[in-house]
């Protein structure tokens, strides 16, 4: 039984990490052709998002500038103007294709996220015994660490999350989440989240140290404050 208890967390962790990713990737590949066919036949506007709309507007502004350039060079030969209009037409067609492709990817990414969330929720509900074993394994692992290693780990984690260079990492992660879910890239919202998350995490950490660590391991708190200073 102890051997089974020791080996259980590793396949369970591996399945949590790789199984949702593998299933969602397979679902993505198998559903891609159907979504492309459905989108091309229906051309629904339901999934229009601000990110793609902004890109389309930027590209159409460029095309408008080309049309203004066309008006300025009317003294050129008709052949030259005809070639210019053909080029603008091809660029417009390419823009529409890119717009549709981005919408298709948005639908697939959204479906993949739902699948991953569903699988992880099923793990948390059905794998209660494995979660208990994993929790006991983590507690035993942390208990065997020295107070110096624990303090160093806490200090390293806090510096990564709320350190001097942490806003760059938060900005990157929030931007990836926005892009993955199709939200509009708003600099004000991202700046607000980047400035808020580290403060919240710092407050929670200080409360945890004051309420929990002071009671469980006062020596760890002393070492942590000494290393932090």
UniProtKB/Swiss-Prot annotation:
It is a multi-pass membrane protein. Pfam families: CemA (PF03040). GO terms for cellular component: chloroplast inner membrane. Its main location: plastid. It catalyses: K(+)(in) + H(+)(out) = K(+)(out) + H(+)(in). One of its GO terms (biological process) is potassium ion transport. This is Potassium/proton antiporter CemA.
